Amino acid sequence: MRLHVIPSPFYAANGLVLVPSGAGTALVVDPSAGIQHLIREVLQTEGVSVGAVLLTHGHPDHVWDAAEVSTWGLDGTTVPVYLPGPDMYRMDAPASFLPMSPPDFVGEWVKPTDLREMPAESVELTLGVWIRMVPAPGHTEGSAVFLGHSPLDIRVNNQSFYANEE
């Protein structure tokens, strides 16, 4: 599995794209504002579509482009967007939780159409990506730790930093 780390200019959040070998789909995690084009580049380079979107918590810098990215499923289908339950209310108006106005490059907020509560048990969010959520409230009410098991090749700006060939 390859893990692409995509730094965002929106409060320095990181978006992630997890691409399991041979699956044809990817899991996009925390698609922040200002990185849509970079997420799309990774998807095109890998030859995959979006299988699901995971939001680790409900802060705006982690959720902003989830609605758009969720429409990049196979043949333009809309895929589920998962978020820990306690943060669901934040999706109605995430900008209201910012201490200041969002940066100029941040577009208008659009709530995802297929927003789902992240299950507490281990689930396969997209083919080949099994994730288990462990609640860890503090940063937000819905903050969580997400556990998975897979050999990883970690990439930043398409450069490999760590490869585990297990």
Tell me the role of every PLM-derived stretch.
Residues V17, S122-I154:
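Core dinuclear metal-dependent hydrolase active-site scaffold
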Residues R2, N14, T25, V79, ...:
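A generic secondary-structure signal marking the coil-to-beta-strand transition
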Residues F10, W109, G138-H139:
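Short Pro/Gly-enriched coil loops immediately N-terminal to beta-strands
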Residues M1-E46, V145-E166:
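Conserved beta-strand hairpin/beta-sheet module of binuclear metal-dependent hydrolase folds
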Residues L27, L54, V134-P135:
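Residue in the alpha/beta-hydrolase core beta-strand immediately N-terminal to the catalytic nucleophile
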Residues I6-S8, L115, V134-P137:
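Short Gly/Pro-enriched turn/cap motifs at secondary-structure boundaries
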Residues A33-W130, F161-Y162:
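Active-site HxH/HxHxD metal-binding segment of metal-dependent hydrolases
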